[in-house]
């Protein structure tokens, strides 16, 4: 993978997400509401709400917006009732794609997701068709130049499972989903800030796409991420640095 740069891929994805900040806020508010409804309004006793709260803070969401979403969820206020749905499918060249949704209308959502796949060179698969290619875990990615020793010390004390540094100096820390908040707090206490973090579906093996295939795959991912009911899109694809 001579042209594959993990850091370039991370920066590219982060830039796309930042450009969709309004959309991102909507998705985070939905996540906060569902988390509060399921586990209560106290982020200290509701790990899922804590993660959503931290995500909102990282996205510069005003605290009033966060509190309103919590109150709406914890208070059981009338309104939409969302269910979580996961779809699996294939993109260009058989690339694996997982689409996590929150929806108040499963029929509408599956139709939109299926249409996006079909229109942009992919196809919707059956449950379990690609999930085995991913690991559910907490993930932290630190920029080149970050002290590997400091990251390792904080991570291991907090119970991280794996720490790896690539040839570019990008440090990746993986932990169990249940340990995500503890590891994040350990990094904060050590003055360390990950470039990206979250509880994710991490690809076990990567597939590199270049040229026209990369352009088509990027379009498919963009369309899926733009759907109102879609919360997260995961793929095992990495793109050539030139893309």
From Swiss-Prot:
GO terms for biological process: regulation of DNA-templated transcription. It is found in: Cytoplasm. One of its GO terms (molecular function) is DNA binding. The keyword Lipid metabolism does not apply. One of its GO terms (cellular component) is cytosol. Pfam families: TACO1_YebC_N, Transcrip_reg. Belongs to the TACO1 family. PANTHER family: TRANSCRIPTIONAL REGULATORY PROTEIN YEBC-RELATED (PTHR12532:SF6), TRANSLATIONAL ACTIVATOR OF CYTOCHROME C OXIDASE 1 (PTHR12532). HAMAP family: Transcrip_reg_TACO1 (MF_00693). NCBIfam families: PRK00110.1 (NF001030), PRK12378.1 (NF009044), YebC/PmpR family DNA-binding transcriptional regulator (TIGR01033). This is Probable transcriptional regulatory protein BPP2422. It comes from Bordetella parapertussis (strain 12822 / ATCC BAA-587 / NCTC 13253).
């Amino acid at each position: 993978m001579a042209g594959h740069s993990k850091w370039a891929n991370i920066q590219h994805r982060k830039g796309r997400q930042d450009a969709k900040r309004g959309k991102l806020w909507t998705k985070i508010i939905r996540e906060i509401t569902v988390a509060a409804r399921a586990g209560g309004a106290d982020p200290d006793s509701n790990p899922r709400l804590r993660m959503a709260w931290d995500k909102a803070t990282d996205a510069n969401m005003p605290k009033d917006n966060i509190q309103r979403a919590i109150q709406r969820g914890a208070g059981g206020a009338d309104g939409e009732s969302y269910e979580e749905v996961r779809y699996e499918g294939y993109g260009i060249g058989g690339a694996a794609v997982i689409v996590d949704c929150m929806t108040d209308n499963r029929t509408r959502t599956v139709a939109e997701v299926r249409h996006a796949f079909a229109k942009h060179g992919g196809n919707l698969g059956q449950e379990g068709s690609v999930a085995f290619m991913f690991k559910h875990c907490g993930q932290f990615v630190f920029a080149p130049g970050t002290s590997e020793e400091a990251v390792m010390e904080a991570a291991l004390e907090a119970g991280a499972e794996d720490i790896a540094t690539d040839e570019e100096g990008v440090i990746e820390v993986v932990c169990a989903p249940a340990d995500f908040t503890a590891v994040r707090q350990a990094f904060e206490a050590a003055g360390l800030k990950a470039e990206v973090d979250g509880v994710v579906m991490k690809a076990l093996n990567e597939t590199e796409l270049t040229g026209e295939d990369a352009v088509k795959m990027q379009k498919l991912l963009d369309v899926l991420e733009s759907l109102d009911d879609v919360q997260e899109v995961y793929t095992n694809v990495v793109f050539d640095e030139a893309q």
